[in-house]
A protein has these predicted regions:
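Generic beta-sheet signal
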Residues: 2-5, 96, 144, 165
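A conserved catalytic-core segment of Leloir-type glycosyltransferases
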Residues: 4-57
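An aromatic- and histidine-rich active-site surface loop
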Residues: 8-12, 54-63, 71-109
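Acceptor-binding helix/loop patch of EC 2.4 sugar-transfer enzymes
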Residues: 32-49, 92-129
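Membrane-proximal helix-turn-helix segments that form the acceptor-binding/catalytic region
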Residues: 59-69, 80-82, 88-89, 101, ...
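Short beta-strand scaffold positions
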Residues: 73-77, 143-144, 164
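Carbohydrate-associated surface elements
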Residues: 147, 168
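Short acidic capping loops at alpha-helix termini that bridge into adjacent secondary structure
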Residues: 159-162
């Protein structure tokens, strides 16, 4: 099955995944995306908390529906509970991370804010904590570039756990 926080209509033209396999869990992601799209967040902290909760909601929903061992691929910050359930059943867990190691990312952002004399906006701590646990509990972490790969190595993640899968295609 393919679980998503996006509403079902976003997949109306999807041809590669059978319609019956797409399970939409939009209760928190849809309002989050609406507020994000139109910059309607009154406070950054509220945005960060809502984002964390939307990932958490999807994660818990998926975990409740795992009944046998599977190969589970989850975007980072949305798989910890599912990983734990799947691991108990003997499954394989893959954390898909499209950007650098969360601590590395936070450090670079902080440096850049300070470089330009701005107040640093750090990543929401609960997200950092959850991602770090996911890195530890995942069997593999997929990353899209050598730069991202190297950020994980610098933060102590083993080469054996990392899988470099570059985005794009050669046509």
């Amino acid at each position: 099955s393919f679980y998503t926080g996006y509403p079902r209509f976003k997949f109306k033209d999807e041809e590669l995944i059978p319609k019956g396999k797409i399970i939409s869990v939009p209760q928190l992601v849809t309002p989050f995306m609406f507020l994000e799209r139109y910059s309607l967040w009154p406070y950054r902290k509220l945005r960060d908390q809502f984002s964390f909760l939307s990932h958490q909601h999807l994660d818990v929903t998926v975990s409740k529906n795992i009944v046998e061992p599977i190969i589970l691929i989850s975007f980072c910050a949305a798989g910890l509970h599912s990983f734990r359930k799947n691991k108990k059943l003997g499954g394989i867990n893959i954390c898909d991370k499209g950007s650098t190691h969360i601590e590395y990312q936070n450090e670079i952002m902080k440096e850049e804010y300070l470089r330009y004399g701005m107040y640093p906006r750090e990543i929401y701590q609960r997200r950092i904590d959850k991602e770090l646990r996911e890195y530890h509990e995942a069997d593999f972490i997929t990353v899209p570039s050598k730069f991202v790969y190297d950020s994980f190595i610098k933060k102590g993640i083993s080469k054996e756990k990392l899988k470099l899968i570059q985005y794009g295609a050669r046509i």
